[in-house]
């Protein structure tokens, strides 16, 4: 495992997980609003 690859991959993984978290949270809010 190249350390440079890890330096590049780590921020990408953080950004991707943060984006998915926000999308999931918004989706849950929309579902709750529709079912309410």
Curated annotation (Swiss-Prot):
Alphabetical keyword list: Chloroplast, Membrane, Photosynthesis, Photosystem II, Plastid, Thylakoid, Transmembrane, Transmembrane helix
Stromal side: 24-36
InterPro entries, per database record: PSII_PsbY
MF GO annotations: manganese ion binding
Primary location: plastid
Mode of membrane association: Single-pass membrane protein
Transmembrane regions: 5-23
GO aspect biological process, one term: photosynthesis
Pfam family, one: PsbY
Subunit organization: PSII is composed of 1 copy each of membrane proteins PsbA, PsbB, PsbC, PsbD, PsbE, PsbF, PsbH, PsbI, PsbJ, PsbK, PsbL, PsbM, PsbT, PsbX, PsbY, PsbZ, Psb30/Ycf12, at least 3 peripheral proteins of the oxygen-evolving complex and a large number of cofactors. It forms dimeric complexes.
NCBIfam families reported in the protein's UniProt record: PRK13240.1
Name of this protein: Photosystem II reaction center protein Y
Source organism per UniProt: Trieres chinensis (Marine centric diatom)
Name of the gene this protein is made from: psbY-A
